[in-house]
Swiss-Prot record:
Name the record gives this protein: NADH-quinone oxidoreductase subunit K
GO CC entries: NADH dehydrogenase complex; plasma membrane
Catalytic activity: a quinone + NADH + 5 H(+)(in) = a quinol + NAD(+) + 4 H(+)(out)
Organism encoding this protein: Shigella sonnei (strain Ss046)
Gene: nuoK
Membrane topology, from the record: Multi-pass membrane protein
Length: 100
């Protein structure tokens, strides 16, 4: 069995990597990938904690996180396609530019 600390450290590292990708990158696709990594890291923390205490609540939260990630991915990819269709690039800064 993997110790609780190792699983939580791995989840924290993954969360920080996802947060870094979300903050640093300006491409919408890479921002969505960073957000997915963050959601999966939090789901991993739930599973590790639930396994440590012998409860199934962590697995239930994992299923909830996966369904949330699927909904987020479908909406995010729809926005990504519309942005690419209208602006011909995926730079998130081009969305904030207003036409005058």
């Amino acid at each position: 069995m993997i110790p609780l600390q190792h699983g939580l450290i791995l989840a924290a590292i993954l969360f920080i990597l996802g947060l870094t990708g979300l903050v640093i990158r300006r491409n919408l696709l890479f921002m969505l990938i960073g957000l997915e990594i963050m959601i999966n890291a939090s789901a991993l923390a739930f599973v590790v904690a639930g396994s440590y205490w012998g409860q199934t609540d962590g697995q239930v939260m994992y299923i909830l996180a996966i369904s949330l990630a699927a909904a987020e991915a479908s909406i995010g990819l729809a926005l990504l396609l519309q942005l690419h269709r209208r602006r011909q690039n995926l730079n998130i800064d081009s969305v904030s530019e207003m036409r005058g």
